[in-house]
Amino acid sequence: MSHSISPIGHVRSCFKEKFAIPRQPQLAPAATGVLELLPPFDTGDAVEGLEQVSHVWLIFLFHQALEDKPRLKVRPPRLGGNQSMGVFATRATHRPNGLGQSVVKLEKVEPGRLWLSGIDLLDGTPVIDIKPYVPYADIVPDAHNAIADAPPSSIAVHWSDEALRQAHEHGLRLCQPVRELVGNASPRTRARPTRSRRPSAAMACACGTSTCTGTTPPMARSACWTCNAPPTETSLSPQD
């Protein structure tokens, strides 16, 4: 028997490429995104009461890892990609039905939009369902996992003055807190800042929305998040 499911919305994420995404949610608290709900879930009725919740579970599709033939064994990155395990013993993206789940922080609730942080989702990810995180039920005090018994190791990031300047410029261009993202990322997601080829600028819209506050989703798209109008650039001076 087969079942058909349809997305209730899509995530607009700061992660545009799958190879830069943290392996688990909450590893990069500064990673932000917006879940844009589709009709009929975009009227506000479906999210009424959700403002009382701090975190939510997102059930989603690994839309860039869907396969016709299911894999019985996978090579999880945590084991260096050299050891295979049964797919059900891992959180690998290659799932029998392409389903994933992440618990993320709910920053703000609006009709048709949920503002999120601590995400590990690719831009455009289809979301199948939303469920509130319930601490007394979702926390299992005596749970254990011998495969992943500790968080991934962190690598200290030492910023030179030039790297800080570049991070600031890229942060303004991308409307993302680059320094915080790099500092909170897991080893797989760390990247060396590169020289900017354009002057730093902030993206603003005629509707008055400013997107370079470090708390809003990226403006690396052709329209404003609020009113869907094309953005304009406003030059800013770098801050050390």
UniProtKB/Swiss-Prot annotation:
Keywords (A to Z) from UniProt: Methyltransferase, S-adenosyl-L-methionine, Transferase
Superkingdom in the source lineage: Bacteria
PROSITE patterns: TSAA_1 (PS01318), TSAA_2 (PS51668)
Domain TsaA-like: 5-142
One GO term (biological process): methylation
One Gene Ontology MF term: tRNA (L-threonylcarbamoyladenosine(37)-C2) methyltransferase activity
Record-linked CDD domains: UPF0066
EC number(s) given by UniProt: 2.1.1.-
Annotated positions binding S-adenosyl-L-methionine: P22, R23, Q24, H63, Q64, R91, L122, D123, G124, T125
Classification via Pfam families: TrmO_N
Stored NCBIfam families: tRNA_TsaA (TIGR00104)
UniProt name for this protein: Putative S-adenosylmethionine-dependent methyltransferase RcsF
